[in-house]
């Protein structure tokens, strides 16, 4: 049967298509918007049956043009957390998603979509419950509102509906995201270009570079998606993160020392990186004040209760592997 992936040329989407291909799934319809044409590079190594623009997809899916569809992985959305056009975000991230969910329910098709840890805002608890959801941006609100729509449909849903709340995902295939690429990718590119990594200084009770996020490897994200594909009776909203918050300082140490190792240079401790000017701290930008999550850490209890038992890749291992991958490709 056909599997449809929206946002297929994007970061998570293209990696998911590769993960499906690795299992022998090639009857895949890729849906995206190639307004950013350079995203096509992510699809070059993918085996797909067809490609559609997102604006053409919904009507054709509603008409049943793809026959029996096993699952729709909905990863297409505006992922720019700094986007200020609320109408655009609500149309793309909320209304489009809501229409697609209803079509999947009507056709008895598994629906697995991308939510975001942005729904939690500055909450100090990251559990999938309404009382902990306090988005700081209109992007986070668009994701939050669709999650509420999903909750309102779950009780009567006869087919699978799964929302996956991604924390800070990193890995191959994200370079096109520019300022929305992971901290790992940004630090790698900055150090290669300038010989230093620049982090946020003190802000909101967090010391220089001590802002901490839950960094999760794209490999783990793909595995979680495939788990729910294989377990169509599981529905709900689930966090997808390592369960461990790591500081930007921690990540920078791994990035810089991986690059130093490639030049046969010894690793340096955080204090040494700062002393040698390889790590600098900048004033926290005014544009992010009141809109930035200084701390995130996934509560994976619900995911584990659903039966997902695989361990998550440790930050040190995953970041070093990703940096080596970038080096091998001359990036």
From Swiss-Prot:
What's a Gene Ontology MF term here? Answer: ADP-glyceromanno-heptose 6-epimerase activity
Q: Tell me what reaction this enzyme catalyses.
A: ADP-D-glycero-beta-D-manno-heptose = ADP-L-glycero-beta-D-manno-heptose
Keyword Isomerase among record annotations: yes
Q: Which Pfam families match?
A: Epimerase
As to how many cofactors bind and how, the note says: Binds 1 NADP(+) per subunit.
Q: In which residues is NADP(+) bound?
A: 11-12, 32-33, 39, 54, 75-79, 92, 143, 169, 177
Gene3D superfamilies in alphabetical order: NAD(P)-binding Rossmann-like Domain, UDP-galactose 4-epimerase, domain 1
Q: Does the keyword Disulfide bond apply?
A: no
The cofactors named for this UniProt entry are: NADP(+)
What are its GO biological-process terms? ADP-L-glycero-beta-D-manno-heptose biosynthetic process; carbohydrate metabolic process
Specify the domain of life of the species encoding this protein: Bacteria
- Where is substrate annotated to bind? 168, 179, 186, 200-203, 213, 292
Q: Sorted alphabetically, which keywords does the UniProt record give? A: Carbohydrate metabolism, Isomerase, NADP
Instruction: Give the EC number(s) under which this enzyme is classified.
Output: 5.1.3.20
Active-site residues, as the UniProt record annotates them: 139 (proton acceptor), 177 (proton acceptor)
Q: In which pathway does it act?
A: Nucleotide-sugar biosynthesis; ADP-L-glycero-beta-D-manno-heptose biosynthesis; ADP-L-glycero-beta-D-manno-heptose from D-glycero-beta-D-manno-heptose 7-phosphate: step 4/4
Q: What class of enzyme is it?
A: isomerase
Q: Which family does it belong to?
A: Belongs to the NAD(P)-dependent epimerase/dehydratase family. HldD subfamily.
Its UniProt domain note says:
Contains a large N-terminal NADP-binding domain, and a smaller C-terminal substrate-binding domain.
* Subunit (UniProt): Homopentamer.
**Annotated PANTHER family:** ADP-L-GLYCERO-D-MANNO-HEPTOSE-6-EPIMERASE (PTHR43103:SF3), NUCLEOSIDE-DIPHOSPHATE-SUGAR EPIMERASE (PTHR43103)
Please explain the role this protein plays, according to its UniProt record: Catalyzes the interconversion between ADP-D-glycero-beta-D-manno-heptose and ADP-L-glycero-beta-D-manno-heptose via an epimerization at carbon 6 of the heptose.
What protein name is recorded for this chain?
ADP-L-glycero-D-manno-heptose-6-epimerase
Please report the organism this UniProt entry assigns to the protein: Cupriavidus pinatubonensis (strain JMP 134 / LMG 1197)
